[in-house]
Design a protein with these regions (language model features):
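Short, flexible coil/linker elements and helix-boundary hinge sites characteristic
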Residues: 58, 66, 109-110, 174-177
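Amphipathic, non-transmembrane alpha-helical secondary structure
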Residues: 79-90, 110-118, 161
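Short glycine-cluster motifs
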Residues: 12-102
Length: 182
């Protein structure tokens, strides 16, 4: 939790979106977020329309669902993560994002961490990462996220608790400083 509070801006609400390329862990993360007191709501019609436009252009796979968590499938690429994350960061119904780029072969290349970090620059909404397990690749992903200032967790439950801490801190700031997170 401390890393999240140290490196990320507070979430100005408790509505979280989860972006992954592995459906099962995304659902586990959604459950963990809800159990922690966060909301994993449906996306707005505007956001869904943007995602559908990406599908129509061939920028997203047709099998990707528009539900939250968003599952790019095992075929998701670094570019897809970046484009969808940008849409989520712009969405008014999303206060923070949890990204879970699992290192599946072949489309998830080493540049997925950089692509996500570069996309997040300029946004004030918090982003956390999760790559489950203790494999060398998972540990490498988490280390690289941390180098970019994006706290990365080994379990969805830890990531959810950290995001909840950001939402609670944001709520505290809004109560005590109504103009926002000054």
């Amino acid at each position: 939790m401390g890393r999240a509070l140290q490196f990320q801006k507070p979430a100005l609400g408790n509505r979280i979106s989860i972006l992954t390329n592995a459906g099962g862990p995304g659902v586990i993360a959604a459950d963990a977020c809800i159990e922690s007191g966060l909301r994993v709501d449906s996306l707005s019609e505007t956001t869904l329309r943007e995602l559908e436009e990406m599908k129509a252009k061939g920028e997203l796979l047709g099998i990707m669902t528009g539900s939250n968590p968003l599952d790019l499938s095992g075929q998701g690429t670094s570019e897809m993560f970046a484009k969808v994350l940008r849409i989520l960061m712009d969405a008014s119904e999303v206060n923070g994002a949890l990204v879970m780029p699992f290192h599946q072969a072949p489309p998830i290349l080493d540049d997925v961490v950089r692509a996500i970090a570069e996309t997040h620059k300029g946004y004030t909404k918090p982003i956390l990462a999760c790559d489950v397990g203790g494999t060398e690749m998972a540990e490498d992903f988490r280390t690289r996220f941390e180098k970019y200032g994006i706290p990365a967790y080994e379990t969805p439950e830890r990531a959810a608790r950290a995001m909840y801490a950001l939402a609670r801190y944001g709520s505290h700031l809004c109560i005590h400083h109504p103009s926002g997170a000054d």
